[in-house]
Swiss-Prot record:
SUPFAM superfamilies hit by this protein: Ribosomal protein S16 (SSF54565)
Gene: rps16
Keyword hit for Coiled coil: no
Gene3D superfamilies: 3.30.1320.10
Main localization (coarse): plastid
GO cellular component terms attached to this protein's record: chloroplast; ribonucleoprotein complex; ribosome
Family: Belongs to the bacterial ribosomal protein bS16 family.
Name by which UniProt lists this protein: Small ribosomal subunit protein bS16c
Subcellular location as annotated: Plastid, Chloroplast
Amino acid sequence: MVKLRLKRCGRKQRAVYRIVAIDVRSRREGRDLRKVGFYDPIKNQTYLNVPAILYFLEKGAQPTGTVQDILKKAEVFKELGPNQTKFN
């Protein structure tokens, strides 16, 4: 199973995160399938590769809670069909 989750980057006390599609069994810093976005909580900047995110969501990828909140704020779920917006 594939999840969309945050991968920590940056230095101490200055964390930035990549939004990645990654296998559930992998560690947080493990090898990702594809980088699909970027999130900087300090500057409150977000970059999303929307076509790649939609591709993984259509294939059944599950976003984590934090990634789901980021995607809701960016209104990515409006581009999905109404029956595809339910996640565990």
